[in-house]
Design a protein with these regions (language model features):
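Positively charged, hydrophobic/aromatic-enriched amphipathic segments
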Residues: 1-55, 98, 103-105
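Acidic, low-complexity, intrinsically disordered interaction modules
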Residues: 36-99, 103
């Protein structure tokens, strides 16, 4: 999927994360808000200044979302894409695979 396609996905909330603790909090909030109530996804912005930190944030977000959905007995069929958002940020967009299909991506 191209960056333009990724950025055309409707976003419910954008999280600008600075560190690992922010990643855990954002993942828990995404699960609380829910992936299936609206035809929208979530966007995570991570700093490019430290590639190692960005990788850890991305890993924490994706694994915490999956494990939290399992704990809440919700469907875990989530798609995500990582991309270069801008000069200062990497981005991840997370969205339900059903929403991706309904939106025609």
């Amino acid at each position: 999927m191209e960056k333009a396609d990724i950025e055309s996905i409707p976003i419910k909330k954008t999280f600008d994360l600075k560190d690992e603790k922010d990643a855990y909090d954002a993942a828990e909030e995404m699960v609380r808000i829910g992936f299936y109530k609206e035809k929208k996804g979530f966007k995570i912005l991570m700093p490019k200044e430290s590639k190692k930190t960005a990788k850890r944030i991305g890993y924490i977000v994706t694994t915490t979302v999956t494990s939290s959905l399992r704990k809440e007995k919700q469907e875990r069929d989530i798609k995500y894409w990582t991309y270069h958002h801008d000069k200062e940020h990497y981005g991840i967009v997370l969205v339900s695979s059903k929403v991706v299909e309904e939106l025609g991506f």
